[in-house]
């Protein structure tokens, strides 16, 4: 029985480790990120929590896949000024909306919510840039989604 418990704990730990983002953190790459293209803004999307590590849906901006909701990971998308919907879908689609201005940086936090069968990822636009930058600091840059 003890051996079975140890095996289960090790398997669970492996899933958590494999499912988490790895690579350079926002703090490490911030200075080397390309500048925001002229006339565009940048949307950063990040997930700080390990809770629900196995739940990693694709994240969309205006129905275009831009990344994946990996624990402790972030990605960004440069877009023209305008109104945008950021969404993630598991059993249900959760979304939040934002308006982007030229040169502006907006931050969207991906929160984990309980669900009937699986957890849900719910995007939440962060009210101010300082909070977003503070929360994203230890998240790792994710590769582009294929």
Which residues does each predicted region cover?
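Sec-dependent bacterial lipoprotein signal peptides
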Residues: 1-20
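Short loop/turn and low-complexity linker motifs enriched in small/turn-promoting residues
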Residues: 20-146
């Amino acid at each position: 029985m003890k051996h079975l418990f140890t095996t289960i704990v090790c398997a669970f730990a492996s899933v958590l480790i494999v499912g988490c983002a790895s690579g350079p953190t926002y703090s490490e790459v911030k200075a080397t990120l390309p500048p925001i293209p002229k006339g565009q803004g940048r949307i950063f999307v990040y997930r700080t929590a390990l809770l629900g590590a196995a739940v990693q849906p694709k994240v969309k901006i205006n129905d275009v896949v831009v990344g994946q909701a990996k624990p402790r990971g972030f990605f960004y998308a440069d877009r023209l000024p305008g109104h945008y919907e950021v969404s993630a879908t598991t059993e249900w689609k959760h979304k939040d909306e934002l308006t982007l201005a030229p040169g502006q940086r907006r931050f969207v936090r991906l929160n984990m919510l309980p669900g009937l069968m699986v957890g849900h990822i719910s995007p939440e636009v962060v009210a101010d840039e300082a909070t977003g930058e503070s929360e994203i600091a230890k998240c790792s840059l994710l590769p582009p989604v294929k």
